From Swiss-Prot:
PROSITE patterns, sorted: RIBOSOMAL_S7
Alphabetically ordered keywords of this record: Ribonucleoprotein, Ribosomal protein, RNA-binding, rRNA-binding, tRNA-binding
Lineage of the organism: Bacteria, Bacillati, Bacillota, Clostridia, Thermoanaerobacterales
Pfam families tied to this protein: Ribosomal_S7
Residues of the signal peptide: none
InterPro entries cross-referenced by the UniProt entry: Ribosomal_uS7 (IPR000235), Ribosomal_uS7_bac/org-type (IPR005717), Ribosomal_uS7_CS (IPR020606), Ribosomal_uS7_dom (IPR023798), Ribosomal_uS7_dom_sf (IPR036823)
Protein name: Small ribosomal subunit protein uS7
Cysteine disulfide links: none
GO terms assigned for molecular function: rRNA binding; structural constituent of ribosome; tRNA binding
BP GO annotations: translation
Cellular component, GO annotation: small ribosomal subunit
Subunit structure: Part of the 30S ribosomal subunit. Contacts proteins S9 and S11.
């Protein structure tokens, strides 16, 4: 079976309002059923709430939140001699960003009540302050990698 070359990575287009590629990725993650305009309204509304509540530039708060959420190491399962080991590996920069955005949106969705823009704003502000579900997920991921450091020599 012939193999075709690797598919080239597509560059994300910066969003029209803030000119941020990270915000485009957040919008894409929030989007459900291809409804981009709804996702944009949610994200821009959330950033407006962040601006009102913190008095800071919302993109700065989002950048800080992403820094606090993006994992440096994660564990990947590796089968060795009939046993599965969780092997700690470093996370690539693009995956780091993807995981950060994914965790922020998923933990925002899990928050009780209110509208999605309020939940997303709350999760972004919590992450920027170093608390919240997404930051806890990152810490758990790092703790798991630290606990399995003994299997680091199985890295591939």
């Amino acid at each position: 079976m012939p193999r075709r070359g690797a598919v080239p990575k597509r560059e994300a287009v910066a969003d029209p309002v803030y000119g941020s590629k990270m915000l485009t990725k957040l919008i894409n993650q929030v989007m459900l059923d291809g409804k981009r305009s709804v996702a944009e309204a949610i994200c821009y509304g959330a950033l407006d709430i962040v601006r009102r509540k913190t008095g800071r530039e919302p993109l700065e708060v989002l950048e800080q939140a992403m820094k606090n959420v993006m994992p440096i190491v994660e564990t990947r399962p590796r089968r060795v001699g009939g046993a599965n080991y969780q092997v700690p590996v470093e996370v690539r920069a693009d995956r780091r960003q993807t995981l950060g955005v994914r965790w922020i949106t998923s933990f925002a969705r899990q928050r009780p009540g209110k509208s999605m823009k309020e939940k997303l704003a709350a999760e972004i502000m919590d992450a920027a302050n170093g608390v919240g579900g997404a930051v806890k997920k990152k810490e758990d991921t790092h703790r798991m990698a630290e606990a399995n450091k003994a299997f680091a020599h199985y890295r591939w």
